[in-house]
């Protein structure tokens, strides 16, 4: 259960609401500054965010990310779970995986839009950068991604399959119109998770297909270790910054993983399978 994770000045109004039984602190739009460690941060207003001309997200995305005041990347849309901000806060405190610094997150009560105000990452996403990379550079970046996944998988287990603070999954595999908690979790074990995935598929697929799939699931999807998982490792969610060259003259990079909306504890195969599907089986 997160507490008052944002330390604010006395003029900032605070409002605690409930989202899936977890208390989040909403910093309302009237907040002008926040204090993080010894840093006083002047936040952009909603008006400044909505007027931002530099759009960082893809044109067809329902969620918008903009560059504001040189310092901030702001993600906003209806339906973004505030837990995405909590995930990044959690990872910054509990792992060595590089993630954007989160300054604040809130819901605008007038529009019901979620806003996550983060640091702006200087660099390019891997989707944009990939065509210009040399084979040796691709190998270096692949190793960095692998190392990040290994670090994620070393995060302590909470004793369930689900997201931070014993909350349900946000992956579309578990989506139902009524947000059925029996389908979205959290789950006690992989067997329960498998049953609920098949139950979810029953809503859209033919029974013959489910029967065939049941046999495959029973014979393969068991005894996997639960590990912390990003869940959406598309190339566009891997930011790459060039660093100073190594002593041997070879190029050096660092990667920052973004878009932590569906992260949580999943069976160990989940990261690979989701990344493969997201990349549409492209060799690179």
Report residues per predicted region:
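ATP-binding pocket architecture of kinase catalytic cores
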Residues: 54-181
């Amino acid at each position: 259960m997160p507490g008052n994770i944002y330390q604010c000045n006395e003029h900032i109004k605070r409002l605690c609401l409930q989202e899936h039984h977890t208390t989040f602190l909403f910093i309302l739009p009237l907040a002008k500054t926040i204090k993080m460690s010894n840093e006083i941060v002047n936040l952009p207003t909603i008006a400044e965010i909505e007027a931002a001309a530099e759009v960082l997200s893809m044109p067809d995305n329902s969620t918008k990310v903009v560059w504001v005041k040189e310092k901030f990347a702001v993600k906003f849309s209806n339906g973004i779970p505030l837990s995405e901000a909590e995930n990044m806060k959690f990872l910054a405190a509990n792992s060595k995986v590089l993630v954007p610094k989160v300054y604040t997150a809130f819901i605008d009560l007038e529009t019901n839009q979620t806003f996550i105000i983060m640091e702006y990452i200087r660099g390019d996403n891997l989707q944009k950068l990939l065509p210009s990379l040399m084979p040796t550079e691709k190998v270096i970046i692949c190793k960095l991604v692998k190392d990040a996944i290994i670090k994620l998988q070393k995060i302590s287990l909470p004793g369930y399959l689900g997201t931070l603070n014993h909350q349900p999954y946000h992956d579309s595999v578990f989506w139902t119109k009524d947000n059925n908690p029996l389908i979205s979790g959290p789950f006690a074990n992989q067997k329960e998770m498998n049953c609920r995935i098949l139950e979810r598929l029953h809503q859209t697929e033919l029974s013959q297909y489910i029967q065939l799939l049941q046999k495959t699931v029973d014979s393969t999807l068991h005894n996997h270790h639960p590990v912390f998982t990003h869940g959406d490792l598309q190339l566009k969610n891997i930011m790459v910054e060039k660093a100073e060259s190594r002593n041997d003259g070879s190029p050096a990079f660092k990667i920052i993983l973004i878009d932590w909306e569906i992260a949580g504890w999943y069976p160990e195969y989940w990261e690979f399978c989701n990344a493969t599907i997201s990349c549409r089986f492209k060799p690179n």
